Design a protein with these regions (language model features):
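Nucleic acid-binding interface residues in structured DNA/RNA-binding domains
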Residues: 2-159
């Protein structure tokens, strides 16, 4: 995100923008890709609440959060674009406020990948995860990415 220092992420987190809601999609490719036509749109604070539930030493991929929200709200899938935006908003909102911290660094991208859009980028996320006992590995030579090693073993389960 650009101009993070000028944005009020806590105000963005509080806005519901008409969500939550279920939207029926009609595009055949989208239905085939996600396995259904009922797309759940969750407000940013729902992502924040789930991110806050991940305990010390555990991690959760964004995909697991999306699956949980769809399953518990009678939908086939959640919107992947807003999900990515809303976890970034939750991270930056936590970074901007004092108290009531959201442990955003525990929410990973697919495959256990660290999120470069979080405050401080992948290096800050790496330090926080290593402080919780995780091992971070680097992949790639030109397009370097960082991952939590054996992330599946540390996954938090949403019930």
């Amino acid at each position: 995100m650009s101009n993070e220092d000028r944005k009020d992420f806590n105000a963005m987190l509080a806005r519901d923008n008409g969500m939550p809601k279920i939207q029926v999609v009609t595009d055949a490719a989208t239905i085939a890709k996600y396995g259904g036509e009922r797309m759940y749109l969750a407000p940013p604070r729902m992502y924040d609440e789930i991110m806050k539930s991940v305990p010390f030493g555990r991690i959760i991929p964004l995909g697991a959060i999306r699956e949980y929200l769809a399953r518990t709200n009678g939908a086939d899938f959640t919107d992947p674009i807003t999900a990515g935006i809303f976890v970034s908003i939750a991270a930056w909102a936590s970074f901007q406020r004092s108290g009531s911290e959201t442990p955003y660094w525990r929410t990973l991208k697919a495959g256990g990948e660290l999120n470069p859009k979080y405050p401080g980028g992948t290096q800050a996320q790496r330090l926080k995860l290593e402080a919780e006992g995780h091992t971070i590995i680097q992949r790639g030579r030109k397009n370097i990415r960082y991952y939590v090693k054996d992330y599946e073993k540390a996954m938090h389960t949403l019930i």
